């Protein structure tokens, strides 16, 4: 089983408008910002929904690592850059301040279109996730503390091969479970016993 957990809330205040350079700086500051302390009730709720034994993975970004440290202080996570949030770079050069939503929206549009301005293009991310599939299959239980857009992208790719739940919106500290196994024997056995 693969369980994805989105990182805790980041303590960062976005401005309403940015120049291209300002937007890039804000993104870098957000990546270094601290996270909110996780409440005891949230810790219990998350931990209670997990298997007893699992392999822990995080991205290489501070918010993912810090969230994992609060959730699982006795575990040392395996950090993989492929699990990091898919960054949004300025979609154009501009000294004129533009609204934050424009930077975010058009940057994602470029990402979906594999525009080279977005350095980690959709094609590159899909290739990274496909390469990680072998790790997913080899491990019995995995927990990944990751990022919202990266998680949604991963779930879309996993859904091509495996039964996964795909929520529309993944809030901070939300959990998503995926049953990742080879379809040949285990999948057919699952279908027969579940009556699907």
What are these model-predicted stretches?
Residues 1-82, 101-130, 173:
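Active-site-proximal alpha-helix that buttresses catalytic centers in soluble enzyme cores
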Residues 153-155:
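Catalytic DNA-binding helix-loop module of base-excision-repair DNA glycosylases/AP lyases
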Residues 82-97:
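Signature for phosphate-centric chemistry
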Residues 70, 74, 135, 157-161:
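Active-site catalytic microenvironments for nucleophilic, acid-base chemistry
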Residues 2-3, 54, 138-148:
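Generic beta-sheet signal
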Residues 22-25, 162-192:
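Domain-level recognition of soluble alpha/beta enzyme cores
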Residues 8-11, 62-64, 84-86, 148-151, ...:
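Short, solvent-exposed loop/turn segments at secondary-structure junctions
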């Amino acid at each position: 089983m693969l369980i994805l957990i989105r990182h805790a809330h980041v303590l960062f205040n976005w401005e309403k408008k940015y120049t291209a350079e300002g937007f890039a700086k804000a993104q870098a500051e957000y990546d270094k910002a601290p996270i909110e302390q996780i409440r005891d009730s949230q810790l219990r709720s998350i931990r209670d929904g997990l298997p007893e034994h699992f392999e822990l993975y995080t991205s290489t970004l501070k918010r993912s690592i810090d969230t994992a440290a609060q959730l699982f202080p006795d575990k040392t996570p395996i950090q993989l850059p492929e699990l990091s949030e898919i960054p949004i770079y300025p979609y154009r050069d501009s000294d004129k301040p533009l609204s934050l939503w424009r930077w975010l929206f058009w940057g994602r549009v470029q990402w979906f279109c594999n525009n080279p301005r977005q350095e980690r293009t959709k094609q590159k991310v899909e290739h990274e996730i496909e390469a990680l599939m072998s790790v997913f299959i080899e491990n019995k239980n995995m927990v990944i503390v990751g990022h919202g857009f990266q998680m949604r992208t991963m779930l879309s790719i996993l859904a091509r091969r495996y039964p996964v739940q795909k929520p529309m919106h993944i809030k901070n500290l939300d959990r998503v479970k995926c049953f990742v196994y080879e379809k040949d024997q285990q999948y057919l056995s699952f279908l027969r016993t579940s009556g699907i």
